[in-house]
């Protein structure tokens, strides 16, 4: 499910929504992981770093070994563990910058709800919220 730069441009045309979260850089990695957890507990979606949320401008960022380690470390705090492919998309007019994209599959009844650092999240429209305890416990009972 590799995303090209042209597909990315189409994807972000409609601004952030229930299945799309944009972050300017991985400096917002923790907030991004809250959204990733919420995607896993709702309908799934894309988490994209390197796109300004307000202007929708594709800026990208420099990606180092340290950047990749930070992403891997952040993903390791997800419970249960997730196997997500992290895509690094080249930006034609900025050769030293990449957009970082991750797709998370949605939740289905019977699955254990996901947590990030022990806290479950879910999506309400384009907003990421902590999952209410009763909703979390109901999902645990049905898993």
Model-derived regions: residue spans:
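Conserved N-terminal catalytic/coupling substructures associated with nucleotide/phosphate chemistry
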Residues: 1-143
């Amino acid at each position: 499910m590799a995303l090209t730069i042209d597909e990315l441009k189409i994807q972000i045309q409609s601004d952030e929504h229930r299945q799309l979260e944009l972050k300017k850089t991985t400096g917002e990695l923790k907030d991004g992981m809250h959204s990733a957890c919420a995607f896993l507990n709702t309908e799934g979606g894309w988490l994209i770093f390197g796109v300004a949320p307000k202007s929708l401008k594709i800026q990208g960022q420099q990606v180092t070994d340290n950047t990749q380690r930070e992403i891997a470390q952040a993903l390791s705090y997800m419970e249960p563990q997730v196997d997500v492919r992290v895509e690094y998309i080249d930006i034609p007019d900025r050769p030293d910058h990449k957009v970082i994209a991750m797709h998370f599959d949605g939740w289905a009844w019977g699955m254990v709800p996901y947590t990030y650092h022990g806290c479950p999240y879910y999506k309400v429209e384009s907003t990421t919220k902590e999952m209410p305890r009763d909703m979390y416990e109901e999902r645990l009972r049905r898993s």
